Amino acid sequence: MATRVYMHTLGCPKNRVDSEVMLGTLAEAGYRLVQDPAKAEVIVVNTCGFIESAKEESVEAIVELADQKREGRCRKLVVTGCLVQRHAEELARELPEVDHFLGTGAYQDVARIVSDAQAKRLVVPDPDFVHSAATPRVNSLPSHTAYLKIAEGCDNACAFCIIPKLRGGQRSRPIDDLVAEAAALAAQGTVELSLVAQDLTAYGQDLPGKVRLHHLLPELAKVDGLRWIRLHYAYPRDVPDALVAAMADEPKIVKYLDMPLQHSSDRLLRAMKRGRDSVFLRDLLARLRARIPGLALRTALIVGLPGETEADFEDLLRFVEEQRFERLGVFEYSPEEGTPAAEMADQVPDALKRERRDRIMAVQQGISRAHQQAMIGRRLEVLVEGRAEETEHLLAGRHAQQAPEIDGLTYVNDGVAYPGEIVTVEITDAAEYDLVGRVVARDPSRAARPLPAAPRPPPPRRKGGLNVLG
């Protein structure tokens, strides 16, 4: 009987792709993949080491899953990822129950190390691995959606960020290799492709021939079967007109852009070493919205960088009120050893960081509510995910401006559809992050296939002020 392996992934979508590559490598080597750690002889934990809270979550997961080795059928516990790349020796001392530690440059070796009784306990080479279309990969999301990692590493030197030390420098994948992987995913049923990288807009700067992201996008759009292509982790420093035009003119590129801006105060932007000032950021946002009407912008901000004054924070708060981002997340600055920001004077107290985060999110909640209310009455294309977790009486899906895993959902309380089907939904209700609607049109080729309607719902209930059952 094949040895069973369970993968536990923490962190970002880029980490998820790494886990999928490891799963593919293990499956090709004959291992059987399972969803329950209690059934696995091998457990792999792919960690995140970006900020302190992520490191704590990773260690907690390792300790919890180590119970399976003491009390269950697990015979080998393997820990991989960014936390290992950064703290391998310390982890090895503190976690004797772990059999192997693999850094970010050793993902391709996971099957060999798991099967080799003589393999080293610490395998932490330079972080120079990048997978290709030929690398085995198992998509861990529903087959209709997938991530495509177009590059690995980062050449930026943001003062607060440890990622270049964990992932190495920028390494872009060739266009033909990315198209081949996208086509393989589409052949498996993927209709939504989310492009990710540490710095998406730096794509191609390390490749010969002056290849850039705006050259890649039209080639991906030619892949049969793909319907939606979305962009994540765009660095604002390098968004040329050609890229904006490609996003505006190609129908498969959804009107959604994830672009972390981090701050608006010029003093803080200089301290962060972001390379652009607030005038540039405002001009860029205006250019994007003018050229791509209806664009939904997601951004990430940092509060509490050392030296952030109340005036700096008020500048950021005004920026949020002014720009009215459709989606926004806020991180409390986490001092990371080995980064310039960790050595800066005037560290901000944790309580003040939390207060500033909460103030921004309170403002954003009202902005988000207004954006959502404006959706009522509109007809949107919705990618159906399946039955809602809350109740079988609802379908759950996402419209083109709701990214997987990080944004809200669109609940369907009237009509039927298949997981992976894109249907037209009329929006009937809205809350801060989620929408409710009814199916008003389906692709005739899909609608012809029989699917039982959901059971009639019980009396209406509300979710955060949202009447999800109509």
Curated annotation (Swiss-Prot):
Q: List ligand-binding residues for [4Fe-4S] cluster 2.
A: C154, C158, C161
* Cofactor(s) listed in the protein's UniProt record: [4Fe-4S] cluster
Q: Please list the residues that bind [4Fe-4S] cluster 1.
A: C12, C48, C82
Compartments where located = Cytoplasm
Question: Which GO biological-process labels does this protein carry?
Answer: tRNA modification
Q: Does the keyword Iron apply?
A: yes
Q: Where is this region: Disordered?
A: 444-470
Radical SAM core domain residues: 140-370
Which ranges carry the MTTase N-terminal domain?
3-119
Could you name the Gene Ontology cellular component terms for this entry? cytosol
Query: Which Gene Ontology terms cover its molecular function?
Result: 4 iron, 4 sulfur cluster binding; aspartic acid methylthiotransferase activity; metal ion binding; protein methylthiotransferase activity
Q: Which HAMAP family match?
A: MTTase_RimO
Which named protein is this?
Answer: Ribosomal protein uS12 methylthiotransferase RimO
> What is the gene name?
rimO
